[in-house]
Amino acid sequence: MKNLRAVYIIWYRDMLRLWHDKIRLVGAIALPLLFLVVFGIGLTSKMGALGPGVNFTQFMFPGIIGMTVLMSSFMSGVSVVWDREFGFLKEVLVAPINRTSVAVGKTLGAATVAMIQGTIVLLFAPLTGVSLSPGTVLMLLPLMFLLAFSMGAFGVLLATRIKTMEAFQAVMPMLTFPMIFLSGVFFPLEGIPSWMSILTKINPATYGIITIRQIALGTTSGTTFGLNLFGHTMSLWNNVGVLATFGVVMILLAMQSFSRQE
């Protein structure tokens, strides 16, 4: 019970920080919308239809939702580095609680913040021509949370090994931007060069982006905007399984890393 309360307090602290930092929320939403407007409106007429009744803006919109969730959850690891530099993390680590609770609380906080931001972007669906029924939204939310939790655990794991804010700010863009561009946010994964195809398949974000897109656009069969792995067309549940496995591995490693913190 004590450890569960510790998870809640750490999670709640991240919620308070988000509530009192409105500029952070606005900035996190403005960048994805900028991508959507510049690339979507600017290139839709040039790209043509990318699927049955799907133009480039509609294709890109689910990817932008995934990108928002990915960036926000992954970058939330910066709070771990921040807390270390200002001494708060040391106080938490010497508290009479299991250190794994800290990793879980931080990851849940990162995932919840990312979910809030992704849900706000989701509200812009009518402007892109994407029609989302209440049932579709209810299916999207747990998928967004799974992506947020997996990437949040990855970010927290890296943050436990990075000692300064400067180093974190240098490393994170080197990881987030390749993951975004190689996950199919801005282009279909069919017909790309073989070397790039390999990179997309080892990119964990790919499986989250594809799943969100298939649900949002109603192509859950896995044949449209899908991914072939070893000659097998990945189904929606295959993609969920890969992403969930990655998330479990990352949170276990993050918990282990926190237990070794000094």
Region roles according to the model:
Residues 32-39, 56-128, 174, 180:
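Hydrophobic alpha-helical transmembrane segments of multi-pass membrane transport proteins
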